[in-house]
Amino acid sequence: MPDKPTKEKLMEQLKGGIIVSCQALPGEPLYSETGGIMPLLAKAAQEAGAVGIRANSVRDIKEIQAITDLPIIGIIKKDYPPQEPFITATMAEVDQLAALNIAVIAMDCTKRDRHDGLDIASFIRQVKEKYPNQLLMADISTFDEGLVAHQAGIDFVGTTLSGYTPYSRQEAGPDVALIEALCKAGIAVIAEGKIHSPEEAKKINDLGVAGIVVGGAITRPKEIAERFIEALKS
């Protein structure tokens, strides 16, 4: 397992590259109760030249760590109904991820009501106080959410949840306007969400982002096949 990188070192490693999100949830074709599938996707991503991996769950992350030294952005998806945030939504999930010695922990930093009752700035401060050497990424959906997270001391702001909150911009593709605005504000942006093509990734890279995460367009074969099939129907 490699040493945990500094923010500067990680930004050097991520610059101009693609972070591949290797995830599958129950009910999806590539999900397996016994595991073993996500590390194969991560291995393929590494062989293609990916600069990092985004992964969900302690099991998947451990399996991926066993086959690659690429930096990992780790999350734990767990529902806390009736509240909507489910990506590393409480300190309990942060604790589990921190124990894995991964490069970055990503967490929901939207303004939606949280299970723990905290506002997002307070949650970020608590995590930073408990794990001062851990790099953190805020999954947000709007510029204001990104600004709040940045001002609270988050290391990276990800556009992961744009279009997935009812009040954010609803785009079929990536929220380029949000990515550009955050970059212009001097925030270290990890662009993520609905990036479907190499052309979109290139356009986003030219905005000066710190990193780019691509998931479904690479690691969800059902979604990829559906895109081809729908194109022939139109």
Swiss-Prot record:
Pfam family, one: NanE
Keywords linked to the UniProt accession: Carbohydrate metabolism, Isomerase
Family: Belongs to the NanE family.
Family matches, as SUPFAM superfamilies: Ribulose-phoshate binding barrel
Name this protein carries in UniProt: Putative N-acetylmannosamine-6-phosphate 2-epimerase
Enzyme type, top EC level: isomerase
Gene (name only): nanE
CDD domains reported for this sequence: NanE
PANTHER family: N-ACETYLMANNOSAMINE-6-PHOSPHATE 2-EPIMERASE-RELATED
Reaction equation(s) it catalyzes: an N-acyl-D-glucosamine 6-phosphate = an N-acyl-D-mannosamine 6-phosphate
Species for this entry: Streptococcus pyogenes serotype M3 (strain ATCC BAA-595 / MGAS315)
Coiled-coil blocks: none
Alphabetical GO biological process terms: carbohydrate metabolic process; N-acetylmannosamine catabolic process; N-acetylneuraminate catabolic process
The EC number(s) this enzyme carries: 5.1.3.9
Key word Isomerase present: yes
GO cellular component: cytosol
Pathway(s) the chain acts in: Amino-sugar metabolism; N-acetylneuraminate degradation; D-fructose 6-phosphate from N-acetylneuraminate: step 3/5
Annotated function: Converts N-acetylmannosamine-6-phosphate (ManNAc-6-P) to N-acetylglucosamine-6-phosphate (GlcNAc-6-P).
MF annotations from Gene Ontology: N-acylglucosamine-6-phosphate 2-epimerase activity
